[in-house]
């Protein structure tokens, strides 16, 4: 495991030398040149051990490379940061503001938006089990429809609204947080987007718990949602 961790550190260092986030644009959510770095227990190591190594790696990246880091999933130092989307909130463009906010700043290397942070962004380091990433192609160019399907199937679901389910006012709890309608697939995250290269919209999904939702179950549920709105056209690994 130590060799893997060292190789991961050197990869982050090389990415920081080659990639300048100040000129980066793209479709996929990201917060830094090395966006997310999970350690996965393949053999001879436990998830808990991976989490300890991930925290140490996150601190090393911040200390030696001056790249701010968040810890997520099993390595999270705050419960809400188990979710990658919470660490990535606002993406790279929001990092300059978040890095000085005590409630939002990185776990390591926060407090100042340095020149290195501006160039490399932040890195989210963690430990998790195996993840399945799959993109479902739609016979459509509509990002709105792709997102609607993603919101219906992802575990987080969609905000509850008053009246019109699309344009109605979002219902909030006593603390001002949106009240969510859970999606149909446990352990799944999904978003919809348009892929200009292919000329189609996609639902991009990460299955973070393949025991709760095997790939074939996700496939069948996404197809069911497609049939409600659109026509399924294929998938990419």
Feature roles, as predicted:
Residues 1-237:
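Long, contiguous binding/interaction regions
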């Amino acid at each position: 495991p130590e060799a893997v961790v060292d190789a991961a550190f050197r990869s982050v260092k090389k990415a920081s030398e080659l990639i300048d986030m100040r000129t980066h644009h793209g479709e996929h959510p990201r917060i830094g040149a090395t966006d997310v770095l999970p350690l996965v227990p393949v053999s001879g190591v436990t998830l808990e051990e991976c989490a300890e190594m991930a925290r140490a790696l996150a601190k090393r990246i911040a200390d030696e490379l001056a790249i701010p880091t968040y810890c997520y999933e099993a390595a999270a130092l705050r419960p809400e940061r188990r979710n990658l989307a919470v660490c990535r909130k606002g993406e790279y463009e929001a990092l300059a503001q978040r890095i000085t906010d005590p409630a939002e700043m990185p776990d390591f290397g926060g407090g100042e938006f340095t020149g290195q942070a501006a160039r490399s962004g932040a890195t989210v380091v963690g430990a998790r089990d195996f993840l399945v990433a799959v993109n479902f192609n739609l016979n459509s160019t509509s990002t709105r429809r792709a997102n609607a399907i993603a919101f219906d199937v992802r575990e987080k679901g969609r905000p509850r609204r008053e009246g019109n389910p699309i344009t109605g006012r979002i219902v909030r709890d006593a603390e001002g947080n949106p009240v969510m309608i859970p999606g149909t697939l446990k352990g799944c995250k999904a978003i919809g987007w348009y892929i200009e290269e292919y000329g189609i919209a996609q639902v991009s999904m990460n299955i973070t718990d393949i025991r709760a939702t095997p790939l074939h179950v996700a496939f069948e549920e996404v197809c069911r949602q497609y049939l409600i709105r659109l026509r399924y056209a294929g998938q990419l690994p």
